[in-house]
């Protein structure tokens, strides 16, 4: 058993799933020009479970450690269980992260959830079909969606949060836009705070082509 420090070092020195995307996987990437770090996650699904996961990392050692820890945490999980995961579980698996390394867990969470959203957009939405025991809640991160989620849970039904990303204008205040990266993160935090799975489905390209620039 590794102690907290050695857990981080072990993932850096022997990363699980590095440069090993599963066949027929969907991808989710996070990072880019702002910090120079980039993490891409590849997921494959079988019988409602994550049966394959790998990643690539460009940047600091913490990014490799978070990608590796993500592989261990998510592989074999049911889709809804994976959609409950985030930076908190990653930081715990690595024994905590310093302020300088915490951004790596943020990028790993974002890459994971973009890949999960790509699974749904690619045709796996049937796994979230509404039933008497499950209700999809459109989450914006605001008060109304939070109350709706609580009411559904109070009825005894399983609430699953979904945020549709239709438009993102970097020239506007992201905190005031329902589709901005900040709003998506806020919606995910809300869902996870209520112990709900959360999915973000990125429909910006088809929305732009079909609605904004038809």
Please place each PLM-identified region on the residue numbering.
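Domain-level signature for proteins that mediate thiol-based redox and metal-cofactor handling
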Residues: 1-136, 150, 154, 161
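ATP-dependent adenylation/nucleotidyltransferase module used to activate substrates
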Residues: 125-214
């Amino acid at each position: 058993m590794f102690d907290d420090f050695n857990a981080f070092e072990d993932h850096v020195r022997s990363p699980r799933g590095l440069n090993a995307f599963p066949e027929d996987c969907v991808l989710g990437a996070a990072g880019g020009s702002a910090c120079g770090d980039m993490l891409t996650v590849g997921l494959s699904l079988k019988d409602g479970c994550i049966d394959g996961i790998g990643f690539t990392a460009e940047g600091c050692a913490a990014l490799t450690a978070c990608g590796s820890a993500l592989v261990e945490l998510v592989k074999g999980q049911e889709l809804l269980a994976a959609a409950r995961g985030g930076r908190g579980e990653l930081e715990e698996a690595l024994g905590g992260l310093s302020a300088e390394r915490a951004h790596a867990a943020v990028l790993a969470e974002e890459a994971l959830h973009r890949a999960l959203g790509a699974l749904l957009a690619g045709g796996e939405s049937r796994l979230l079909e509404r039933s008497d025991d499950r209700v999809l809640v459109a989450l914006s991160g605001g008060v109304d969606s939070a109350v709706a989620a609580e009411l559904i849970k109070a009825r005894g039904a399983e609430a699953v949060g979904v945020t549709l990303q239709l438009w993102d204008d970097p020239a506007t205040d992201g905190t005031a836009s329902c589709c901005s990266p900040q709003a998506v993160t806020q919606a995910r935090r809300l869902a996870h705070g209520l112990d709900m799975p959360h999915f973000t489905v990125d429909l910006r390209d088809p929305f732009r082509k079909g609605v904004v620039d038809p």
